[in-house]
């Protein structure tokens, strides 16, 4: 290596010397001569400075080559970096433009959404202002509020009237006592009643401060009481009242016989309490002592007391109701004691008050009194003065008066309108009347007592038997059926005689005033009555039973279970299956009664098929075409390609919404 390097260095030096000599022609010759001389004289020259210069040149060349290589590498890398930077810059620009576009689109979408929301709010506000349902609910609430307020005002008004009774001759039909009346006319008991009523009015005014709770059934209960009257008229429920001690008092008061000193004030509307009392006062009568002493010293047993509570009593609201025959509206007939000899009067204290007589009934307007055993009633009430009335009203107690209160609390009527029809069923049944009837201006009936009729009065004689009248009508209407007499057997006659003792008793009573008929005539009449009963009652009842059985069979019909085709369902709807009624006929005849319990769900599913077919018929198609259409809907292919039919239940489910 060193030899090669030395040779290379020598060659470079020779090249350098040659280049120098070429620069000067004269020098070339001189140099060559000198070199030759030197070479001959010095065979191995060793210059010391040449190796140092050669090493530095080599280092510079290597360094420069390395620098150049590095520069090339840097240049390539810069080029690559520039390209990458350009790519990144382009992507940033693209993303920036995309973000700007998104912002712009978002702003436009926000504006559109805001405008739509504003329109929707405006529309909702318009709907809320024009919604008929909201208006209906508002009107309903207003109506309920108005009804409640008017009801409360009316109750308050009625309560005020109960505390202050307006005693007017024009409205109530009796003379109004004035402050100038003599105390002897009123009597000590009457003034004691006024004082008691004043104290009770104060107590009731305190009780009226309780919180009122509206009873939703109150309107229904009061409907009978206000059926014929207007809202401005006052209901005068005036009840006949008796005192256990024998003295007659004003309605609803406990009179005292110990007070003999009259109070020095006159009767005014402000200190008179209404006759409408609580039912609790009637309950207090049940707590009477076992033996009650009457005014004449006799002792009333509990049996007589209870009998007195059950005795009938009649009330007349005012003179107007008596003039227009309000009693006749309820068919209250008194054949034995409403005649010329047995007068019905309204008695009074004193003899100077006016007396009226209308239709054989003597009416007077006065305060109450017990006059020589006659029962008197205050406030325009009917008074019965004869012995027959004593027997009816008193029974075994010989007309001893009892105190009866017949007004419900708050004036509520407990039953509905069926009471009037129930009362009409018992018309012309007088006998021993056990009616507790209160006649008001509105012709209402107090509902707490159910009318019952006893065939015999207290004298033991039949007064007016509805059955006997009905049988007498049968005699006049069935005179052409006498040929049926011989067709009945004696056994039937004897059986009827045992069951009809009451009718035989009626035929023998002196009240009928008929001569005793022969036995054959009575038998013929009885057989005629039996035939009449059979033709008019038993046969129609059998016919009704057959109709009811047919109706029950129709109502108990069950829809066909799991029908195989739509045609079967339609046939059942139109004509019926196996003689059973058709579904359409049942709907037209009974409505939904036949399917309320048993066929409710099944019919609701079948109804979709019925409606689908009927809609097609309305559009001009036939029932068969609609049935075929439904049957085609049932066809489908399974996974093997076979054609099968879906169930009727699937078909009914697919028709939901029709």
Curated annotation (Swiss-Prot):
InterPro entries: HOT1, TF_GCR1-like. Keywords: Activator, Nucleus, Transcription, Transcription regulation. Residues 1-55, 218-237, 392-550 are annotated as: Disordered. The keyword Ubl conjugation does not apply. Residues 219-229, 522-532 have a biased composition (Basic residues). Residues 33-55 have a biased composition (Low complexity). One of its GO terms (biological process) is positive regulation of ribosomal protein gene transcription by RNA polymerase II. It comes from the Eukaryota. The keyword Secreted does not apply. GO terms for cellular component: nucleus. Residues 434-443, 455-467 have a biased composition (Polar residues). Residues 22-32 have a biased composition (Gly residues). Residues 407-421, 485-504 have a biased composition (Acidic residues). One of its GO terms (molecular function) is DNA-binding transcription factor activity, RNA polymerase II-specific. Pfam families: GCR1_C. It is found in: Nucleus. Required for a complete transcriptional response to osmotic stress. Belongs to the HOT1 family. This is High-osmolarity-induced transcription protein 1. It comes from Candida glabrata (strain ATCC 2001 / BCRC 20586 / JCM 3761 / NBRC 0622 / NRRL Y-65 / CBS 138) (Yeast).
